[in-house]
């Protein structure tokens, strides 16, 4: 109390909640606090989080901590170290003719690339990317791995490569989700938050079809800030429990993307190729990827 008064000029009646990690706060912000709800906080990188009443040993994820988000529940976390950063890299590598066309259409280059990529049918996609341009966090836990592009020909348009970057992040998420489901932590719904899902309908559509899960996009770009506000509301006795605060204060749904059966099936061969390359260069011969 003396510290609050002397340093911050606050009265002793002011209540301050404990701190929380930003991605963990985002779980509260989207209201994904029930078992089977998988939160993907998609920004420059992605954090994948789940809550469960049980602690189950799951290899190749970051770990699990009791009470980290909701009292009494275990918070499980995994992640990908380059997602939005990967798309920014792709934008910066775009050839001049695409940049010029984007300018002619008065569109940001990234938006124009996504528009072009959205017209590529899954069956036409012949490029597969290993999205390790910043190493691999989950499920290989190897920061020395580097990215690779497979399937290039002289006819490959650049927007196909950009689409492959997006698909690779979805494939990586599917591998992470498989780790949970193989260890009896089922997933029925994906909550997509962070700075990217509201901006990229193509990404959300690709994720829904690759993961074969419903993807819920929340109408808030500040889920982590909202989660922090929930902590404040709880400690200030506006709500009796943090769970009550989360259910009462969560933002409305912007839209829900359901998987489309034909597209789910069409992605299976590409995902299989990704997994084969993932294991070849990530597990069997990782030294081939140690180029830096």
Model-derived regions, located:
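Active-site core segments that coordinate phosphate-bearing ligands/cofactors
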Residues: 4-191, 195-292
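Extracellular and organelle-lumenal recognition/adhesion modules and their flexible linkers in secreted
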Residues: 1
């Amino acid at each position: 109390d003396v510290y609050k008064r002397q340093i911050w000029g606050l009265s002793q009646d002011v209540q301050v909640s404990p701190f929380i990690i930003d991605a963990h706060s985002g779980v509260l912000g989207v209201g994904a606090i029930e078992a089977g709800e998988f939160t993907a906080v998609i920004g420059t990188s992605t954090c994948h989080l789940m809550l469960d009443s049980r602690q189950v040993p799951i290899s190749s994820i970051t770990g699990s901590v009791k009470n980290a988000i909701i009292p009494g529940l275990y918070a499980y976390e995994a992640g990908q170290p380059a997602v939005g950063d990967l798309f920014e890299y792709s934008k910066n590598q775009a050839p001049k003719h695409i940049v010029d066309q984007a300018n002619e259409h008065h569109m940001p280059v990234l938006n124009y690339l996504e528009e072009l990529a959205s017209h590529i049918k899954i069956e036409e996609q012949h490029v597969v990317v290993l999205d390790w341009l910043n190493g691999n966090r989950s499920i290989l836990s190897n920061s020395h791995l580097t990215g690779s592009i497979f399937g290039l020909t002289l006819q490959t348009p650049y927007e196909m490569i950009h689409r492959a970057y997006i698909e690779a992040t979805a494939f990586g998420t599917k591998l992470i989700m498989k780790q949970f489901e193989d260890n009896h932590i089922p997933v029925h719904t994906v909550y997509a938050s962070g700075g990217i899902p509201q901006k990229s309908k193509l990404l959300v559509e690709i994720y829904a079809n690759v993961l074969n899960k419903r993807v819920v996009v929340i109408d808030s770009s500040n889920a982590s800030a909202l989660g922090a506000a929930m902590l404040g509301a709880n400690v200030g006795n506006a709500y009796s429990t943090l769970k009550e605060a989360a259910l009462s204060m969560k933002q409305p749904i912007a839209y829900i993307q359901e998987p489309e059966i034909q597209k789910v099936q069409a992605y299976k061969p590409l995902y299989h190729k990704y997994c084969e390359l993932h294991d070849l260069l990530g597990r069997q011969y990782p030294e081939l990827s140690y180029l830096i």
